[in-house]
């Protein structure tokens, strides 16, 4: 009886067959975005689910295509002046790298502007099609490479700007992007020797936004807005 129990415990503890590359320098992460509907909020929602530090810049007035950026995203700050382009510029230059998630190529509108601005400012930028079968692997491997290439030898957090189309431009992209990012973060937590959680100066886990706020995010197409939105 005892032998059978021990065998069951051994079977349950079998190592996963997934073999993943590991960075040489495990680092905490911070996820930022402009708080727009769609990919921006998917990045924040996925980070919130893992208590990863979040932040970023919103347009002046916290503008978004559904009105204003939800109060649940209280770590986001308003740009002192300017609109969507100013928000984009500040998030790019305040980040170590930018991840762009899209349904189709080529990039257009504000998404294309984000990629162009990152290139002009020497910031790494990765564009991933959510429909790619290996989208999760692409993102995971790129993030691992950043842990070694961004300020090599340092242990400070890496700031990742997550960007892409708004919800009305790619209906359903919030859920697709969030699902993909949750898979990436799960890989890090389970298999990569650590997780992406925000860590304070004393090495303690920091839960920056309660997970309950994930539920207030809407996937419904917003009402018409007369101002150009990106």
Task: Pin down the residues of each PLM region.
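Acidic, glycine/polar-enriched metal-coordinating patches/loops
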Residues: 222
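Charged phosphate-binding loop/patch that engages nucleotide di/tri-phosphates or the phosphate backbone
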Residues: 179-217
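Acidic/glycine-enriched connector segments
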Residues: 11-12, 16-159, 166, 171-188
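Non-catalytic, low-structured ubiquitin/UBL-interacting segments
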Residues: 1
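Non-Sec secretion/translocation targeting segments of pathogen effectors
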Residues: 227-230
């Amino acid at each position: 009886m005892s032998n059978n129990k021990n065998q069951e415990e051994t079977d349950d503890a079998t190592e996963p067959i997934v073999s993943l590359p590991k960075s040489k320098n495990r680092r905490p992460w911070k996820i930022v975005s402009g708080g727009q509907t769609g990919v921006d909020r998917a990045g924040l929602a996925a980070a919130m689910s893992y208590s990863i530090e979040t932040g970023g810049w919103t347009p002046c007035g916290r503008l978004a295509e559904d009105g204003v950026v939800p109060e649940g995203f209280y770590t986001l700050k308003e740009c002192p002046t300017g609109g969507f382009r100013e928000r984009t510029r500040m998030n790019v230059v305040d980040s170590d790298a930018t991840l762009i998630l899209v349904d189709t190529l080529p990039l257009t509108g504000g998404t294309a502007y984000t990629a162009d601005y990152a290139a002009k400012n020497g910031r790494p930028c990765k564009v991933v099609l959510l429909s790619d079968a290996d989208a999760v692997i692409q993102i995971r491997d790129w993030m691992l490479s950043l842990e070694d290439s961004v300020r090599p030898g340092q242990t400070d957090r890496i700031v990742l700007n997550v960007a892409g189309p708004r919800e009305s431009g790619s209906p359903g992209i919030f859920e697709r992007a969030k699902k993909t990012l949750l898979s990436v973060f799960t890989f890090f937590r389970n298999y990569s020797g650590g997780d992406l959680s925000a860590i304070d100066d004393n090495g303690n886990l920091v839960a920056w936004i309660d997970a309950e706020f994930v539920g207030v995010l809407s996937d419904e197409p917003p009402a018409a807005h007369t101002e150009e939105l990106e």
